[in-house]
Amino acid sequence: DENRFKMLTKGKKVIMKYDFTSILDRNGKDAIAAEHIPIPGAQVKEGFDRIPMWVADMNFPTVPTVVEAMMERVQHPAYGYFDPSEEYYASIIRWQEKRNGVTGLKPEHIGYENGVLGGVISALNVMCSKGDNVLLHSPTYIGFTMSLENNGYHIVHSPLVKDENGVWRMDFEDMEKKIVKNRIHAAVFCSPHNPCGRVWERWEIEKAMELYKKYDVFVISDEIWSDLILEGHKHIPTQSVSEDARNRTVAMYAPSKTFNLAGLVGSYHIIYNTWLRERVLKESSLSHYNAMNVLSMHALVGAYKPEGYE
């Protein structure tokens, strides 16, 4: 329960595993999942509970090493300008190597993003002109829909289809037709897929990336859900399926879904292609809005400690 976390404020270093049994009362603790209904005038009927199916927010406490890392930093009473630490980059590289089998990842390939959606738009602004068509699979995460449409991009949907076993699959024939007909040169690929929950198999990603290569389509791969995989499945990073995919793809990650850190804000991109990386970095910096929070940095480092792997 919450009293266990209070021990951290008393100077006692407590190493605990992720707690999936404690029930948190989040009322009055800055949680829209507990206190907000996004439908004007809607109220919870008497005898019913509020179930926030509309937002990806867990009621589990985060891994204790996150709290510990932030508490240690908070005790130093200055929070001025800073640069990302070596430990920040090392934590991400180690996480990607151990969790996803990534090789060759270096600090210069990693860049901070205030959020995955903001990173998606920065990348699209480099890959496209406003008004361009962008390929997405449907059903489509509403965040993509709102972000792309608000920024002047037209979404072309390629619907997923169920195979004979009831598994949602990409329709490669439809994708090719849509790419050609709509002169598409950028696609947003959600892996694992939100909302269907598909963890794509390697051959599926390879086939999609072959299509994108054939028609010179840049790819933004949102892999924010890649840590939450059920047994019997394995996340395959889009950039890992071929050398062309490695250079054609901007990948987006964050600890926010995995460790319930959305309120801290802090995502990151991985871009191997120097031409793409330099332009995305420039685009995301133009407004001076895409700046890291020092506590967010320490939260990521805490999340990516050994306890986080468990």
Question: Which positions does each model-derived feature cover?
Answer:
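PLP-dependent aminotransferase class I/II
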Residues: 248-310
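Short, Lys/Arg-enriched N-terminal segments with co-localized hydrophobic residues
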Residues: 1-15
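N-terminal small-domain helix-loop-helix segment of the aminotransferase-like
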Residues: 17-115, 122, 304-306
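Walker B beta-strand of ABC/ABC-like P-loop ATPase nucleotide-binding domains
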Residues: 188, 219-220
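Walker B catalytic acidic pair
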Residues: 223
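A short helix->loop->beta-strand "cap" motif at the edges of active sites that frequently abuts
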Residues: 153, 214-217, 246-247
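Conserved core of the PLP fold type I
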Residues: 75, 79-210, 227-228, 235-240, ...
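Alpha-helical elements of Rossmann-like donor-binding domains used by nucleotide-donor carbohydrate transfer enzymes
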Residues: 65, 69, 91, 174, ...
